[in-house]
């Protein structure tokens, strides 16, 4: 992934999940992982760990980045230190079509509220889905199939006090208690150090 014309690039989203009992190994590779992200920081729009329900322990990651094509995107993922070290239990790579980004304001206010990654299958969407609290929206977009022809999932990163507020702010018709609709998920997320810190 050398220097190329950024206007010729597509966006991709990669969601990873760590294997069980790998936290110690993850810490050993973390510095190399952060250096890798800093190396490509001009291509990365958002990146950071997915956290457990307590918002403390990393259990995976989510990154939106630019690449020339699917092969270039796969190369970015496969050369990432966590991937090479065998720490990742699963990797989901999709094309991404972003709608908006409000990253600076979100960074400024992240201390007063957490960030949540919300995803919902396109098949489970219904008329009237919307954002009840647009001020809490950091970014949104659609994951796409490998040929960039079909949307597969609606993705939103939102700022909220807890998962219940995130659920209500994204899709007001989601139940406040109980399980999310089929094909939907809300997980805690935070901006990664490699992206929010100086190179």
Residue map of PLM features:
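Conserved, structured core segments of small domains
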Residues: 2-199
């Amino acid at each position: 992934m050398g220097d190329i014309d950024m206007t010729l690039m597509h966006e991709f989203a990669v969601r990873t999940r760590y294997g069980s009992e790998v936290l110690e190994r993850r810490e050993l590779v973390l510095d190399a992982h952060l250096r890798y992200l800093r190396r490509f920081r001009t291509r990365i729009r958002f990146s950071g760990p997915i956290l457990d329900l307590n918002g403390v322990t990393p259990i995976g990651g989510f990154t939106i980045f630019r690449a020339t094509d699917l092969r270039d995107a796969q190369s970015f993922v496969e050369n990432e230190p966590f991937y090479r070290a065998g720490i990742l239990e699963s990797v989901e790579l999709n094309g991404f079509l972003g709608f908006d980004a409000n990253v600076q304001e979100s960074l400024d206010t992240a201390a007063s509220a957490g960030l949540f990654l919300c995803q919902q299958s396109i098949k489970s969407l219904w008329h009237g889905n919307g954002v009840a609290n647009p001020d809490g929206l950091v970014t949104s977009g659609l994951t796409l199939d490998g040929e960039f022809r079909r949307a597969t999932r609606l993705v939103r990163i939102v700022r909220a006090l807890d998962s219940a507020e995130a659920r209500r702010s994204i899709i007001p018709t989601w139940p406040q208690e109980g399980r999310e609709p089929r094909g939907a998920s809300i997980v805690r997320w935070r901006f990664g150090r490699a992206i929010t810190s100086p190179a």
